[in-house]
Amino acid sequence: SKSTWAGILSALGTLAYYGAYVVIILQTISGLISLGTLTFLSGSFKRMQSGLQGIMLRFSQISSHSLYLSDLFDFFAIQPQIVDHPDKIPFPEKMQIGFRFENVSFKYPDADRYAIRGLSFTLAAGEKIALVGENGAGKTTLIKLLARLYDPTEGNIYVDEIDIRSIDLASLRKNIGIIFQDFIKLHFTARENITIGNIDDIESANELNGSLESKIKIATQKSLADEVISSLPQGLDQMLGRRFDNGVELSGGQWQKIALARAYMRDAQLLILDEPTSALDARAEHQVFERFTQLMDGKSAVIISHRFSTVRVADRILFLENGQLVEEGSHEELMELDGRYAELYNLQARGYQ
């Protein structure tokens, strides 16, 4: 192995170094070389050893860096498995029917069990649904299929009765805004953190214009990020995070508001929120969803949350268990059903009593 060879070479180098010392000392004792020559040679050996160690260190660093480069080139060589259909069509300019899952099953590559099994439901245009269930129920997997980060193992997903695999990928993802629970904290300016939610707007604006600034303002108001921006010394031009000089670190809740603004900036037909307010306090969460129901009027939305106070804003709630849909209906209907949803709701409610 690499460490074994490194040990052998180090031992040989040490033996050669001290072996040379023994030879010149013996030659000095026998009178073949003078004491001055001994001093000169010993100093030369020491300098030569330092030089050789430096060279070996450089080779070791080159070898280490080449491994990183190898990983980088391997990454560049990866070919996407989800590709456009040869006869792709654009996402509907305005959804009329919505999404439909038809007996969808899915398991991750190299996995033994299905993450989702036999799932059938609809998400109507303009409807807001909530996905509820315990960890591992398949909620996040479902929204990955909606965004076509994966294709179903079995079954089909339709958008306005068009197979989602026939829709242009760029067009599909432009019309879907997603905030995952592990959202990314970008060490950019506040403006860049928000506008990166819609790259087309950045590229089309050679300089800051009223239209772009207006969109930023609307997105920050929807997400309550306007309060965060107003508290920053340089406003939208403030660098966020501590990676760069003069950067300002935000709290978890403030970062989450910035991430929400990024999603609103896309102005998509479908907004997916995966635990979007997990870092917000109760008051901020209430304000966010109070605005959410008003501002998402006419647009579709999927909310994933373990907070039952949050999912009540949805038109319909889907309760998932072991990758299957076991209950479906409004909050009132599911409470009347007195099934798994009601059980978990009452369990959570008892914690506040």
Each PLM stretch: what is its role?
Residues 1-19, 57, 61-64, 80-81, ...:
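An intracellular "coupling" helix at the cytosolic face of ABC transporter transmembrane type-1 domains
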Residues 1-43, 99:
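A hydrophobic transmembrane-helix motif
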Residues 37, 71, 171:
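Ca2+-coordinating acidic residues in Ca2+-binding motifs
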Residues 77, 84-353:
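ABC-type nucleotide-binding domain
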Residues 23-33, 60-63, 77-80:
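Juxtamembrane transmembrane-helix termini
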Residues 20, 41-77:
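Cytosolic ends of transmembrane helices, especially the final helix of ABC transmembrane type-1 domains
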